[in-house]
Amino acid sequence: LIKVYKNPKKGLGSAIETRIKKSKKIYTCIFMCDLSDDTNDIVKYYNTVKRNKKLDAVLGTRFSKDSKVTNYPFLKLFLNRLANNIIKLIFFSDYNDFTNAFKIYKRKTLIKLLPIVSENFNVFLELPLKIVTRNYFYKIIPINWSGRKIGVSKFKIKEMSSMYIFTLFYCLFEKILLNKKRR
């Protein structure tokens, strides 16, 4: 069953926030519709989150020994790995694929992550960073990925890099403020 909702604002982040607010389901799975994500992994996500009710999210990684990645352009792969490893170091995290869109979340956890400040692809960085920095329970599982099968990418690295940097600093400052508040 597919439902279409009118998005009151422009942007991917706003569209995802609208869907989170309108959803009545327990879990929300976010993935790209270019068929690069292996839809069989949705079952792995769901089974993982159902087995452990404490989990707020299951974060997929394309970069574990059990993942299979094909047709990833070299420059894009290199920049992706570089960025994700820098993020991993900055946030002292065990997760290595923050920029990947394909994840599953408990809806009630997503509601607590609102508002979403990202308007574009950087929303896929914002959500897992908030999961990690706010100490929600998550599990990392290997997923498969193959290059885009349909459509044309709207991702422009020069335009998007500043948005990703903004999101990174936003979440870093939030982490610092949350840590001070807990003391």
Per-range role (PLM):
Residues L125:
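DNA-recognition element of transcription regulators
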Residues S93-D94, I116-E119, P128-S146:
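Catalytic donor-sugar/metal-binding loop of nucleotide-sugar-dependent glycosyltransferases
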Residues L1-V4:
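Acidic donor-binding segment of Leloir-type glycosyltransferases
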Residues N7-K22, Y27, N40-F121, G147-I165:
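Acceptor/aglycone-binding surface of glycosyltransferases and processive sugar-polymer synthases
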Residues F166-R183:
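Terminal low-complexity segments of carbohydrate-biosynthetic enzymes
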Residues L35-D37:
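Acidic metal-phosphate-binding loop of nucleotide-sugar-dependent transferases
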Residues I104, I111-K112, L129, K180-R183:
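Short linear elements at protein peripheries
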